[in-house]
Amino acid sequence: MTIAESTAAEAIFLECERARAEGDLIQRVSASDKEYHFQNWVEARIQACTLDYDEPGRNTYPDFRLVNQPEGYEVKGLEFPGREADYDSNSQVPTGNHNGREVFYVFGRYPKAERGVNEYPVVDLVVCHGSFLNADTEYVHKNKSFRGFGSYGDILVRDRKMYVVPTPFALVAGTAGLATLILPADYKVRSDQLVEVGQLERVEVDDVLVSYEFNLQTNEMLTHKKPNPNAGIVHHFRAYRSRGVGDSKLVTLA
């Protein structure tokens, strides 16, 4: 099964839009909960679709891995207004395929937390295939370390990379206040509840970064690139909305 043949993304997206439109609110568990409240909201949507999945853990990727379909869903909640142009991806580069699973991302924006307010709405959301964020599926992140730093040579230096990735809200225009589904163009949607609202293209760069150096004396970083064997390749995507809910507002690259 490939993304071009079948996916649960349609059902999950439509359930997310139904819940958002009908006012199913995000429940904040505690004042210190800054990560899992939107994930819990998405989990309830997956449950409503009667899809079986492995329980998420703090270090699992993607967050929700379906049992009966080779798919996974990574959830990213964003306070609005706030930081919404990009997000921190700790030790994991976004991808459209991970360990044989098609990967989809669920981005949701919600109001900033206020004292005494423990529930709030989903302002807007985007469900997109991971290849819309990054087309490469071969890179494998690894944490590395070495010992020998410091006056006595016994300090360990860990290289634990943090990737800062643009969100769909920054990459495309026409998503504010609505729910949008972005899929590879070769996928044929099956639900008559979905209406196409845009065609999007992302073009691979001429040169790709392959390594970097960090000078511990000057605190300067030097990057190294090489020609991209896929330079100029255009990746085509289509954007969809629920019929009758913002389907006259087009989605375009920003």
Where are these regions (language model features)?
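Conserved active-site neighborhood of enzyme catalytic/cofactor-binding cores
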Residues: 74
